[in-house]
């Protein structure tokens, strides 16, 4: 138990975050952002439609637009905390690729290990992908679709022995991968939702390399769905893929490391909470 956390708890004891309707808000959080968050729409649930206070925002600071801290001082190199974001721009493939393949010194978490990472699969595990597709289909068949007669629909997954291509075809707010298409020798499948995408592309063996050089095992899920994928081919078939990504977690609500670094810049609890739960 640290003195700083004890103090924070005591100073905010009894405070609540309410929606515009006066209802206690669901304060979702995750570990680390890649410099931008997303919205609850990525979960494809009915409840997500009621969580409009969870915005997709850039977690960055700019010396051109400083913010005052609780004691009236200006936090060096910080930006006014507003609802302005680049989320719409980052939902475009080219813009997101430019964003995620670079680091941005103004981002609050630019020095965190999970801020950027790579995941290089040298030999694709087709059986693992097939098994995961079937498991995710059993969990929710509406989010694992099969291409038939030009349209995607929910159908049982057929066995296949080769993967010919993998492509992100849709991004959600902030650039998170929202729909992935996997082409095989027996059919083409669309995987919907960040969780399913993270599960399907994780082979359980390859280690994630964080930007600080440390390696981490990921047995069942990629760290996040904020990534771009670069397939490697041998003639007509995929033999592997390289992923360049950032962040750890789903990206909805408050980034814990983002909040930590905001506090280190001198921002107070109310300012930080108003940023992440602005709506």
Which positions does each model-derived feature cover?
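Conserved, single-site charged/polar hotspot
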Residues: 1-279
């Amino acid at each position: 138990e640290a003195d700083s956390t004890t103090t924070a708890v005591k100073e905010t004891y009894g405070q609540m975050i309410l929606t515009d309707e006066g209802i206690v808000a669901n304060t979702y959080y995750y570990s680390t952002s890649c410099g931008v968050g997303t919205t609850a729409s990525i979960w494809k649930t009915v409840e997500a439609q009621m969580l409009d206070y969870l915005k997709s925002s850039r977690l960055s600071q700019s010396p051109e637009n400083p913010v005052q801290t609780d004691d009236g001082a200006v936090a060096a190199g910080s930006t006014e905390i507003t609802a302005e974001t680049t989320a719409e721009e980052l939902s475009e493939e080219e813009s997101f690729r430019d964003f995620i393949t670079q680091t941005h010194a103004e981002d609050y978490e630019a020095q965190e290990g999970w801020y950027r990472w790579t995941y290089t699969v040298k030999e694709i595990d087709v059986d693992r992908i097939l098994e995961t597709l079937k498991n995710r289909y059993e969990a929710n068949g509406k989010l694992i679709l099969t291409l038939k007669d030009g349209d995607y629909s929910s159908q049982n997954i057929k066995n296949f022995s080769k993967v010919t291509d993998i492509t992100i075809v849709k991004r959600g707010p902030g650039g998170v991968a929202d729909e992935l298409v996997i082409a095989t020798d027996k059919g083409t499948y669309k995987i919907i939702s960040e969780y399913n995408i993270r599960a399907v592309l994780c082979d359980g063996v390859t280690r994630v390399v964080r930007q600080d050089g440390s390696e981490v095992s990921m047995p069942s899920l990629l760290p996040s769905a904020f990534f771009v994928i670069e397939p490697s081919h041998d003639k007509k078939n995929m033999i592997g893929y390289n992923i360049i990504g950032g962040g750890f977690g789903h990206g909805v609500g408050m980034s814990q490391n983002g909040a930590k670094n905001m506090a280190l810049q001198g921002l107070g609890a109310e300012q930080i909470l108003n940023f992440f739960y602005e709506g």
